[in-house]
Amino acid sequence: MARVTVEDAVDAIGNRFDLILVAARRARQIAVGGKRPLVDPENDKPTVIALREIELGLVDSSSMDVIDREEQQHQEAAELAAVAAIVGGNQ
């Protein structure tokens, strides 16, 4: 298991409070959201993987916002397509 120094991750994000928010958000994406890790998992838990990604500069607050926006747009497009299919099927 790789050791992650939180200090390096804090330096990458700016402060420890934002680090907690970004790391928790990314760990949730990996654990529950089915997102692939950007680094080799090496049998690490999602929280450690998230911290390693942050430490390497692969993930930050703004990149998380972009990912969330893209996912929301994709979900909305899928919902609109489903509604269009239902409406089109009823005519």
From Swiss-Prot:
HAMAP family: RNApol_bact_RpoZ. NCBIfam families: rpoZ. The keyword Transferase applies. It catalyses: RNA(n) + a ribonucleoside 5'-triphosphate = RNA(n+1) + diphosphate. PANTHER family: DNA-DIRECTED RNA POLYMERASE SUBUNIT OMEGA. It comes from the Bacteria. GO terms for molecular function: DNA binding; DNA-directed RNA polymerase activity. Belongs to the RNA polymerase subunit omega family. It comes from Pseudoalteromonas translucida (strain TAC 125). The lineage of its organism: Bacteria, Pseudomonadati, Pseudomonadota, Gammaproteobacteria, Alteromonadales. Keywords: DNA-directed RNA polymerase, Nucleotidyltransferase, Transcription, Transferase. The gene is rpoZ. Promotes RNA polymerase assembly. Latches the N- and C-terminal regions of the beta' subunit thereby facilitating its interaction with the beta and alpha subunits. It is an enzyme of class 2 (transferase). GO terms for cellular component: DNA-directed RNA polymerase complex. The keyword Transferase applies. Its EC number is 2.7.7.6. This is DNA-directed RNA polymerase subunit omega.
